[in-house]
Amino acid sequence: MHKCLLLLLITLGSYALHSQEPTIQRDSSAIENDTISKIDYLKYLGNGYFPTKFLNVDLRYLVKFNQYEGFRTGLGGITNDEFSEKYRINSYVVYGFKDHRFKYRIGGGFRINEATDTWINLSYTDDLQETGSSSFLTDKRFFQFFEPRLLNIDLFHKHITKAINIEHKLTNHLVTETEFAISKIEPTYSYNFVIGNESFRSFDISTAKISAQWSPFSHFETIKDKVTQTKEGFPKFTLQLTQSFKNVLKGDFNYFKVDFRTRYKITHNDKVFSEIVLSSGLATGNTPLTHLYHAYPNNITKETVLQRFSVAGINSFETMYFNEFFSDRFATLQIKHFVKPFRITERYRPQLVLISRFALGNMQDIERHQNITFGTLNKGYSEAGFEINKLLFGFGLSFAYRYGGYHLPEFADNLAAKFTFNVSL
């Protein structure tokens, strides 16, 4: 298996290198027609891709770090329209230097309807996933040069997942995605899920998901025979339903999940705006901890503020400690207000961001989850703070304070001081 993965890694790398056009003398019109414009190139980089002729190399897989794998490095990519407008290949392979394991995904898809942008995708994945994390199928790709939370995560579960996925655009404003998947789950930490007289250390899950994103206020135009979003409108709404089936393709549990999120952006004037994100989730039935919810904590368990000094996340709770809370029902509200940048010089313009976050949650049958200790959010969790971004080379500072129902006795334990990193391409 390792030889096969190394071969896949070498093949992807060689393909990316050889798919780039050789540098030759051409007239200006040929260069303009045959090369990616600077704007398009920066858009690719901003989305985490290095474009070549037939393959867009995925920068997410080059180098990462977390507490379980240590350094995680590899290569991945997706074929582009120059390769084919009807078929695509989307794969990666990575290696963790601390756990000494290869992880990989082999996937591809084919388009069955151009007008509705309907694709059928197939994939086989052998990788890790953070316990308690959740995402929407319809979410657009999100890329950061480095992911702040990832540095300190240690609670992962292994999964081998086979999936078939259908993307379909009902209208320009309403896109859907449906997925059928079977997964073998094995937590990397000490955990048993107890139901009656049965105790599960590892388990199989068979799920069906349907996700829909509605953007009623966005504007779209047809440009070069392709529908393009010309204005991003708010609010946006995302809904996802998940059903797990027992005794279907060896599934061990019946459970149902519903997840909802809305995003709203209020633009006051030039470069002054507010962002509001409301998220919620509910899991019923026999749901293991791996598929429940945390509130995206981003604080490590160390003695002093300086020892906890790290990188602030985008939408994470900076004063909430990792693995401190889990819920089978939760809601979070996050509000950010971006003040007009301070014009110190023409190019040096730091920006103040005021932040307030709130989380509420609970859990039934908490005794089912054995060999792990955590709390719930039934008292309501609150934090407030601010960021000063782009102080130097894209770096800034972040401060947050924990108050309310989960305020801690020691002042310093409620305080989080971190740096931020923002770069615009």
Specify the residue positions occupied by each region the protein language model found.
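Exposed, low-structure sequence patches enriched in small/polar residues
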Residues: E21-Y95, D99-L425
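Sec-dependent N-terminal signal peptides
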Residues: C4-G13
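Single-residue recognition of alpha-helix boundary sites
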Residues: G13-S14, S183
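Boundary at the C-terminal end of the N-terminal hydrophobic targeting segment
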Residues: A16-S19
